[in-house]
Amino acid sequence: KLDGCCGVKVFVGSSTGTLLVSNHEDIKKIMKSTKKMISFHSEDEDELIKRERFRKKNKPQTHYIWRDVNTALKSTRKLIANANKTKKKIHILHITSAEEVNILKKNKKYVSFEVTPQHLVFSAPSAYKKLGTYAQMNPPIRDSRHKKVLRQALKNNDIDLNNKNITH
């Protein structure tokens, strides 16, 4: 019982402080333990660790290369599978890739998802060149191919929410 709590947010990939829950058995336990909506920041922690070599200090233009599409997609696929197994409704926060949109559109029984305005407006690498670290966020701004698919999905009402805030 979580009095006064409207939902739970889980970071599957490291993003802000020590809020990480990357083990999918633990994620299934969380899903089974509450009737509240659970929202997920969906990036695969193991992939982030493996790809650390692509991260270059003081070079924001490498951010989207390090945190690539596969890092998000791998986590999103696992979350969809867990939602289907547990029959629990979940929400995946700030989707950034065409591949995620395509898989999520086909799996709406237990899963909703959102996009943020900055992922609809900006694209890599130009956003990083122009804005530097101001363009750096998790998951990252991706190239124009993804922006185009996100915009079309929003137009087609495939996206459940348009979130205005991302703080990490």
Model-identified regions with their sequence ranges:
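Histidine/acidic residue-rich metal-binding segments in metalloenzymes
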Residues: 2-10, 16-165
